[in-house]
């Protein structure tokens, strides 16, 4: 075996050996590999990393005696407690937020008209938009726009509706997949690593 470049590489190898023994899980993953190229492209478009951005009201200012907090082990918590799309995405015809059912993940392409952020922290990246017209940006993030066309997951779509005002929106394409928990052996693996991490945290040597 090759020496892993990082510690995470070692953990991935260990998990891979466990999941490869689960034939039921392998069949489920194989079934998802039949995804249409058009849907795959939408999934790539919808992908977004974490939010790291300055509040533009305070950019370039130095503050003293500030405080912060850290949510420890947030990623393992999400992996263990949240559900994920576990089937292939199929076309549907939803038109609004209220059409979305809690047991399904959604992938949509949506147009927003006269959209404006409610807060000084702006969340939509103009670079992720298929179309962006007549707007104002905060270092690449959209403060407001006459029209944008963007591909989103149901989670990001609901987040945008909660953090932006808009005159109206139009869902032009939509797909759904069933939400399910990750396999038990995966969850148990994460929990085992979490226990080990907390048990040996701060131990000398």
State the predicted function of each range.
Residues 1-205:
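Conserved acidic
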